[in-house]
């Protein structure tokens, strides 16, 4: 039975205990326990305790340092404490003995309680990846050893309430109320498809479908026909040939009979007399038709042995229907990335945006700049980052561990294979190299290159250097880095970027794939950068720049020009063309940059940014954090991994998105309070007629700070991505004009039923992980009531404090229950939900 909890615990074990692919070194004779004592002891702090135990047979002297990773927080050090915790950068910490430390005898434990700023909300916030480095009698560091951490997460009755988080905790009552919306039966047949076709007309009668299929196609559709044949064979066990059989599938060329914005994706399907005719004017359209056909056949397998005769007419409303995957923070291996491409193609998503570089790693080979992958694609124990980068996000000390998501990159050959595979499935891959901020990995790699050559060839050492060693600037990035911004006044910086861009262009060319867009990041450049660089001051004088921030505009202007000369559209996060005060940066008004609008939090005035840009003439992709950041936790529950700074995101929040009425897209604010959607747009900037034309698409984001396995990527995707896929294809739902009325709720219930009845079984059949919605439980008049948003799920519960399993009591009807603590789970298609807890007071 696969659960998110089991996946998390399994991956946590790998993070804490795992070593390299070779011989595993012995674990340390130390162990740690981390306890959250109380969340938000004061307005800004939570209290937590580290317990260090000596499991060896000798006293533990002061010749050790323990390193670990944790979501960036600020530890408040106690006075005269025996231990101290120091942040080495972002998520990387060390714990070491102070002058008040006394040797720890065998079998003894030292307890260290400390206040930390922020609040811990779930499993993604705990310490991970601990290891110890000891020194011998001469002070020489010995090989690192793993230190297991036991996590004593939360005492729910203590930690669930936070003074700074009024969002309701997802306990039994919370889920019961949520699930009540879906308790009524919904009529949902095999024509419930994602995304929904524009028009489905039943023409009467049915056509049988035989496992023996004759596949015919026009020459223009040969590649799509071969792929369809492969999918019919592998997914539906069909015997496909070109001989006449009872079932005939034909792919035919046609002229698009209507005016639509994206005629290359238009298609029709006609089913009649056991003949399934797919028609389109373009290969992309016929591919879309094939995906709809496969979905119909999947649904047919669940409900019938025949297909209704029908005529489907379909096309998308948005030309950009994308997913951004961060492979920099934690890596996604090539095989898993190809699986993701298949998954996206099922639902007619047509853009895969790969975040290939960031502060924590660089993930694509650049011939001639080997240090980017030899050093910056690996993380492990280091004091100078000359061989690898510091550890981050749970993976510990071993930079040679090929199973760790800390380590890895796409070789040139790998990347070209990915491009070809995506092209076959009509998915465009947009590479992102994030600059000038979020560039620490590249900076450290080029610093190491400098050190390698400086004694023998100064010119070669400085050729691609990205930092001014004399720069005294002090700054702190959003992720707590102090050294992650490249120096934009150095010629070597531009030489480096030209080299990187040209090598990536060459990979596309050699793969036979057109590179149409290149994402340059441009986000979260902190205040204080470049102020202490004499190189920058001289550069400003020479180029007539008056403010430090002008350097960023100058730099990005050069990069946009670099791409324009290569006929590549520049893409960037909204930060490129927005000023810090959320006004439009007029400097880029005439640029062609495509803007990803992400920081759209209403409480910070960010919800108006997309329409400000669109109205000003900038093309916009809606990436709204509150709707489409898929790595946000599903809900406020300790077992649900993910972040929450932008709110909680589930499959209903993605469904709620209204691209042309964006202010009505969120139904709760950051505090968890209900939003009056009717009044949400009052006083906000409306979308103009010109602005309407500049909304080019939607994109969901999966940042990987909290990712510990590819199964977790899938867990974040499903079922959240269904709302994204649906809204990108059908931008104006039937309920758009009455977003709080009966039409909205009826459509939402049908949406949920389609996911439960057809899409989750489809995913299970293909071995794709997904989240099972937890059951609701409550007591009334001494009876235990339960419900679920998944009618076919089995609910099991316990009353003794233990975790429910497949052998626990099954809830079927209200039952007498006076237990003070009740736990329940939903079981469905070989998977199970997180645990629902109810304190029955």
Where are these regions (language model features)?
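Short, compositionally stereotyped local motifs that mark structural "simplifiers"
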Residues: 216, 737, 741-841
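Acidic, contiguous N-terminal accessory segments
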Residues: 24, 131-316, 572-580, 761, ...
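Active-site neighborhood of glycoside hydrolase catalytic domains
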Residues: 477-592, 600-605, 610
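Asparagine-centered strand-capping/turn motif at beta-strand->loop junctions
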Residues: 38, 52-58, 489
